[in-house]
Amino acid sequence: MTPWDTTIVLAQNGLNLEGPVISAFPSNPILSSVVYLGATQYAPGKILHDDPDVQRIGAFANQNFDEGVVENKAKRWIAIYNPNDKLETIYDPDVMRARWRKLVYNASYNPVAAILGLDTPRMRMSRHIIDDLIRPIMREIIAAAEACGVSGFPEDLPEIVIRGDPIDTEFKPSMAQDAEKGGFMEIENIVGEPLREGMKKGVDMPTLRTVYGLLKGLQLKVKESRGLWVPGFENGHPYA
């Protein structure tokens, strides 16, 4: 890791993942990669990648680096990753907006699918799951983004995202796949951080808050199954 030269690319979903990395590597440029692809893990080491790889690349806010320096690093990454121009790899100076835009899907379909164990077509078929859970979460995410200064979303964005997945498959978002395998889910950056950012700005987010509580309960079961949580009441527990 060469200071002022080696570039770190974070392709994880969600918000506020860059803070610990910037603290640990203050002398390295940090790029934000917002990735869109479809993949299903059927068994260990067996993954069906059935959708093109699309990336939007930009820089995380980092006062240690001039904007032009990081822009050049982002374009260099694109040249390395996509040398033959066969992939849709785009430099996006407003990559934070792309992160919030992706959360409109990830913070709604992902957690609800994990909690219910349903694929996206079945959630759409049910109607009430869309009306009572998915669309309200999408609107809460957009409201939080706008309160945080990220704007420019089309009015019909929730309706576009609701209908984004094909209906002729039984596709389950990654969080649902993790839950079915008894694995850990990306709860905090996808759900917890957007919720906290919105609440800090005074945005009412009741649907996402309820879903967040349910996800933490599911995660607790995973921790217990792996010996990472032992049931019991510590001293001063309010519900003992």
Regions found by a protein language model. Name each.
Residues 87-88, 119, 151, 204:
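Short coil/loop linkers at secondary-structure junctions
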Residues 12, 34, 51, 61, ...:
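Residues at the C-termini of beta-strands that transition into short coil/loop
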Residues 68-114, 160:
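FAD/FMN-dependent oxidoreductases across multiple families
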Residues 1-48:
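Rossmann-like NAD(P)(H) cofactor-binding subdomain of soluble oxidoreductases
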